């Protein structure tokens, strides 16, 4: 049996590798659920907690990006900069790893919600007063009541 040329063997290797990579991509696209599908599979309690803490996670991500920008602008080594404690250093092991204080975040969120409700009720009160004044001005001069 004649031996195949070297380029033919390498072509088979690249073809097989391409098939494996292509199969992996196709399986990844078809099998992996979307974010909405994952959230819909959660239990109602976990879904409610997920929705409740969504803004907190976004705030933490925003804070982390600020720290990363500050750290990248610094000339110090990465393990010596930033407010995040390293778990490898003894004196920093027990530091809080939270980037955003959850209680403070929820408290300020509730305060903002209360302020919005108060402003809405004040605006509604002003609207009622305006309507009453308009109604009073529209009364006829010949009516006594």
Swiss-Prot record:
Signal peptide: none annotated. The chain crosses the membrane at residues 10-28. The keyword Lipoprotein does not apply. Its main location: mitochondrion. The keyword Transmembrane helix applies. Keywords: Chaperone, Coiled coil, Membrane, Mitochondrion, Mitochondrion inner membrane, Transmembrane, Transmembrane helix. Pfam families: CBP4 (PF07960). It is found in: Mitochondrion inner membrane. InterPro entries: Cbp4 (IPR012420). Residues 107-132 form a coiled coil. It is a single-pass membrane protein. GO terms for biological process: mitochondrial respiratory chain complex III assembly. GO terms for cellular component: mitochondrial inner membrane. Belongs to the CBP4 family. Essential for the assembly of ubiquinol-cytochrome c reductase. It has a direct effect on the correct occurrence of the Rieske protein, core 4, core 5 and apocytochrome b. PANTHER family: ASSEMBLY FACTOR CBP4 (PTHR28202:SF1). This is Assembly factor CBP4.
């Amino acid at each position: 049996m004649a031996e195949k040329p070297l380029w033919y063997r390498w072509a088979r290797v690249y073809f097989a590798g391409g098939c494996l990579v292509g199969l992996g991509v196709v399986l990844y696209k078809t099998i992996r659920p979307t974010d909405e599908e994952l959230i819909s599979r959660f239990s109602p309690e976990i879904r409610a907690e997920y929705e409740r803490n969504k803004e907190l996670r976004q705030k933490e991500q925003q804070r982390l990006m600020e720290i990363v920008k500050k750290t990248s602008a610094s000339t110090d080594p990465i393990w010596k900069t930033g407010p995040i404690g390293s778990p490898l250093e003894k004196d920093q092991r027990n530091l809080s790893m939270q980037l955003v204080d959850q209680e403070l975040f929820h408290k300020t969120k509730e305060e903002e919600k209360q302020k919005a409700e108060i402003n809405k009720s004040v605006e509604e009160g002003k609207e009622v007063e305006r309507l009453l004044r308009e109604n009073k001005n529209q009364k006829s001069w010949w009516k006594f009541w």
